[in-house]
């Protein structure tokens, strides 16, 4: 009796346990104890990896894990466990989680691969940065007196050509003025001084003596009169020289009218006065070998 009672009690206990905890609940409790990437196998009574059944078309136990595994294999996507969906990283770059950090950093470096939204956002940031930098440079230029030009002022090609051509003309004008000044300086330095009196041409002694004789023979206020010349006029005017002592008859001095007689030894002897007449006589020494010899 006791055994039957025990068996009944045991049977009741098992039945009660089965009623209280059906088979599905037991498996659920077992699956709860398994990690996320594993599932509970009721036949083997242990946790198995979900990777072995992800390739099958119909999987119920590891559906979430298999979906996350396939999402990780795709580049630029990650699996959101809250939404239980695969999300592209390109649509959330800038506010991306750590799973999309590598993808978003590479995409930001190459703006060609960015989506249009990110391109617009980035272009707007670049424009804002350029405006801020332009304003900063404008403040610097306004603060400095040396460069009063407006910020962002750009000259066209025609204006640049006009500026350079004007500078070239100014440089040419300065160079021409310098060359003209140098030429005038060299010319002035090479010319003699105009203040110095010009030297008179020297006359031959014969011509000068003849001029003096003509001036002496003719009065100053009257016109010049004809003059005769002779070789041996007034022999008493001749000065004795060594040649005349040896060979007489070869006189050498010059006698000009009423002027003194000049010899080779530069001795002056008075000539006799000639009575006033219409003709003035000028004595010229005879040359050796001439008709007077």
Swiss-Prot record:
Q: What does this protein do?
A: Receptor for TNFSF13/APRIL and TNFSF13B/TALL1/BAFF/BLYS that binds both ligands with similar high affinity. Mediates calcineurin-dependent activation of NF-AT, as well as activation of NF-kappa-B and AP-1. Involved in the stimulation of B- and T-cell function and the regulation of humoral immunity.
What protein does this entry describe?
A: Tumor necrosis factor receptor superfamily member 13B
Q: Which residues lie on this side of the membrane: Cytoplasmic?
A: 187-293
Region Disordered: which residues?
115-146, 192-226
Residues carrying covalently attached carbohydrate according to the record: 128
* Record gene name: TNFRSF13B
How does the annotation summarize its subunit structure?
Binds TRAF2, TRAF5 and TRAF6. Binds the NH2-terminal domain of CAMLG with its C-terminus.
Offer an example of a GO molecular function term for this protein. Answer: signaling receptor activity
Tissue-level expression: Highly expressed in spleen, thymus, small intestine and peripheral blood leukocytes. Expressed in resting B-cells and activated T-cells, but not in resting T-cells.
Q: Where in the cell is it found?
A: Membrane
Task: Give start-end positions of Polar residues composition bias.
Answer: 126-135
Q: Which residues lie on this side of the membrane: Extracellular?
A: 1-165
- Could you tell me which cysteines form disulfide bridges? 34-47, 50-62, 54-66, 71-86, 89-100, 93-104
Membrane topology term reads: Single-pass type III membrane protein
- Provide GO CC annotations from the record: plasma membrane
Q: What species is this protein from?
A: Homo sapiens
Where it mainly occurs, coarsely classed, is membrane
Ranges annotated as spanning the membrane = 166-186
**Which keywords, in A-to-Z order, does the entry hold?**
Adaptive immunity, Disease variant, Disulfide bond, Glycoprotein, Immunity, Membrane, Receptor, Repeat, Signal-anchor, Transmembrane, Transmembrane helix
Per its UniProt record, what PROSITE patterns does this chain match?
TNFR_NGFR_1 (PS00652)
InterPro entries reported in the protein's UniProt record: TACI_Cys-rich-dom, TNFR_13B
Name the linked condition. Immunodeficiency, common variable, 2: A primary immunodeficiency characterized by antibody deficiency, hypogammaglobulinemia, recurrent bacterial infections and an inability to mount an antibody response to antigen. The defect results from a failure of B-cell differentiation and impaired secretion of immunoglobulins; the numbers of circulating B-cells is usually in the normal range, but can be low.
TNFR-Cys repeats span 33-67, 70-104
């Amino acid at each position: 009796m006791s055994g039957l009672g025990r068996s009944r009690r045991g049977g009741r206990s098992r039945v009660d346990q089965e009623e209280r905890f059906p088979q599905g609940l037991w498996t659920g409790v077992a699956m709860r104890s398994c990690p996320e990437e594993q599932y509970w196998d009721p036949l083997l009574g242990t946790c198995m990896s979900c990777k072995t059944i992800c390739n099958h078309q119909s999987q119920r136990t590891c559906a979430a894990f298999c979906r996350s595994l396939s999402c990780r294999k795709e580049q630029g996507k990650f699996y959101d466990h809250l939404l239980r969906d695969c999300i592209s990283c390109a649509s959330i770059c800038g506010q991306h989680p750590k799973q999309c950090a590598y993808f978003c950093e590479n995409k930001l470096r190459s703006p060609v691969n960015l989506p249009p939204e990110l391109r617009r956002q980035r272009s707007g940031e670049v424009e804002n940065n350029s405006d801020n930098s332009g304003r900063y440079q404008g403040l610097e230029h306004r603060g400095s007196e040396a460069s009063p030009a407006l910020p962002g002022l750009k000259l066209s090609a025609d204006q640049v050509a006009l500026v350079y051509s004007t500078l070239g003309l100014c440089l040419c004008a300065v160079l021409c003025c310098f060359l003209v000044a140098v030429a005038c300086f060299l010319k002035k330095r090479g010319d003699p001084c105009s203040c110095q009196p010009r030297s008179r041409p020297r006359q031959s002694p014969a011509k000068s003596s003849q001029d003096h004789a003509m001036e002496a023979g003719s009065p100053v206020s009257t016109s010049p009169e004809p003059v005769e010349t002779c070789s041996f006029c007034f022999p008493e005017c001749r000065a004795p020289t060594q040649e005349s002592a040896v060979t007489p008859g070869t006189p050498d001095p010059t006698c000009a009218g009423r002027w003194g007689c000049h010899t080779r030894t530069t001795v002056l002897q008075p000539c006799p006065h000639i009575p006033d007449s219409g003709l003035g006589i000028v004595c010229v020494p005879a040359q050796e070998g001439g008709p007077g010899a």
